[in-house]
C-alpha cells in the first residue's frame, strides 16, 4: 500500500466498522435514547431481550468508544445475558448540553437509560472511569444493581493523593494531556502508562489516525470530567455499597496504583473480593484478555445470576419428549 493510499485509508475507522459489524452479528443493535434536558445516550442493546436471561451492563473507561474496550469480551456473555454496552456522556455518540460533569450524573443517566429499555435489575462491569460510574450507580440505586465488577477503578482516591505523590503525574493538567492525547507523542506516553509491554515501533501516521477518529471530540468536556473526579474528593464522603463486588487490578497499574485497589477492598468490606493480575497494567482488559474474562465469568456465572445452558441430552429429551 502506497503512503498516499495509507493517508486516504483510516485503519481506525475500519476497525470501528468491524466492531459495529461484530456487535450487530452478536444480536445487538445500536440505539440512541433521548433522556430529555438535552441529554442523549447511545447504547448497544439486545435486538430481542429475553426475560429468562439476567441483564449485564458493560461500562467503558477513557479512551476509544465502548466497542473497542469490550469487543473482545462480548462473546463470553452474549449467550447468558441480555448485554447492554452504553457510551457514557461525551464518548461515542452520547452527549449532553447540561453542565454536570460528575460520575453521579453519569450514573443517573445510565439509570434512566436502563429504565428506558425496561431493565429493572442488572449486574454491572465498569473499567477505570466506568468503574467510578458503576460504583455510583450501585450506591444511588442499590435495588437495581445485583453484582458489581470494578476494574482498575480508583474510586477511593482522594484529592490529597496527588500532592502526596501517589500518582506518576504531578498535576491534573499533566494527567489530562496523557489521558486525552492530542499528539502521537502523548498517545505513546499513554500506552506506556497503560501497558506493561506497550507496542513498539507504531508509526506516527497510525497514531495520528487514531487520535483524529477517537480522541478529537468533546476534548474540553472530557477534561472537565477528569477535573471533577479529583476535586474535593475524600474517602470519608464515599458511600458504602453492599452488593457482591469483584475488584480486578493490574499489578503494575501506573494510572491508578494497586494501593487504590486495596483501599477499595477495605472500604467495601466483606462483600468484596480482589483479584490482582500479574504482568498487567491499567489496560488489563486488553493486555490480559483471557485472564480478565476468566475472572469475570467465575464471578458472574452462577446458578443465581444466570440460567444454565441445557446439555445435549436435555435438548434431545425436550425435543423428542424422552423423559416420559
Predicted regions and their residues:
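Conserved HGGG/HGGXW glycine-rich cap/lid loop of the alpha/beta-hydrolase fold
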Residues: 45-93
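Short beta-strand/loop motif that positions the catalytic acidic residue
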Residues: 241, 247-249, 253
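Short alpha-helix in the alpha/beta-hydrolase fold that links the catalytic acid
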Residues: 243, 257-266
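Catalytic active-site module of serine/aspartate enzymes centered on a nucleophile-bearing elbow/loop
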Residues: 270-324
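Alpha/beta-hydrolase fold catalytic core
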Residues: 1-56, 79-81, 301-324
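Conserved alpha/beta-hydrolase catalytic His-Asp/Glu region
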Residues: 159-167, 178-242
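Active-site loop/oxyanion-hole signature of alpha/beta-hydrolase fold enzymes
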Residues: 48-50, 75, 84-125, 294
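Flexible "cap/lid" loop of the alpha/beta hydrolase fold
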Residues: 135, 139-140, 144-182
Amino acid at each position: 500500500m502506497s503512503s498516499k493510499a495509507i493517508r486516504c485509508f483510516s485503519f481506525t475507522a475500519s476497525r470501528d466498522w468491524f466492531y459495529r459489524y461484530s456487535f450487530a452479528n452478536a444480536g445487538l443493535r445500536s440505539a440512541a435514547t433521548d433522556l430529555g434536558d438535552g441529554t442523549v445516550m447511545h447504547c448497544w442493546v439486545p435486538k430481542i431481550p429475553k426475560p429468562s436471561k439476567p441483564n449485564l451492563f458493560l461500562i467503558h473507561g477513557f479512551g476509544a468508544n465502548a466497542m473497542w474496550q469490550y469487543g473482545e469480551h462480548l462473546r463470553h456473555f452474549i449467550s447468558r445475558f441480555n448485554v447492554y454496552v452504553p457510551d457514557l456522556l461525551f464518548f461515542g455518540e452520547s452527549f449532553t448540553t447540561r453542565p454536570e460533569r460528575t460520575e453521579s450524573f453519569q450514573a443517573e443517566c445510565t439509570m434512566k437509560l436502563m429504565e428506558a429499555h425496561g431493565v429493572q435489575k442488572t449486574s454491572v462491569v465498569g473499567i477505570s472511569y466506568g468503574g467510578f460510574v458503576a460504583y455510583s450507580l450501585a450506591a444511588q440505586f442499590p435495588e437495581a444493581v445485583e453484582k458489581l465488577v470494578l476494574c482498575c477503578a480508583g474510586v477511593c482516591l482522594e484529592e490529597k493523593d496527588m500532592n502526596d505523590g501517589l500518582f506518576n503525574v504531578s498535576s491534573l493538567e499533566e494527567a489530562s494531556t496523557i489521558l486525552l492525547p492530542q499528539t502521537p507523542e502523548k498517545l505513546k506516553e499513554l500506552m506506556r502508562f497503560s501497558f506493561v509491554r506497550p507496542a513498539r515501533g507504531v508509526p506516527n501516521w497510525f497514531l495520528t489516525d487514531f487520535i483524529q477518529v477517537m480522541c478529537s471530540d468533546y476534548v474540553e468536556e472530557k477534561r472537565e470530567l477528569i477535573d471533577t473526579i479529583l476535586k474535593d474528593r475524600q474517602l470519608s464522603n464515599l458511600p458504602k455499597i453492599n452488593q457482591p463486588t469483584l475488584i480486578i487490578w493490574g499489578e503494575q497499574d501506573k494510572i491508578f496504583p494497586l494501593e487504590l485497589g486495596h483501599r477499595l477492598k477495605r472500604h467495601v468490606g466483606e462483600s468484596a473480593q480482589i483479584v490482582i493480575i500479574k504482568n498487567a497494567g491499567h489496560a488489563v482488559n486488553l493486555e490480559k484478555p483471557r485472564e480478565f474474562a476468566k475472572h469475570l465469568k467465575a464471578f458472574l456465572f452462577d446458578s443465581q445470576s444466570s440460567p444454565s445452558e441445557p446439555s445435549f441430552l436435555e435438548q434431545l429429551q425436550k425435543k423428542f419428549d424422552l423423559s416420559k
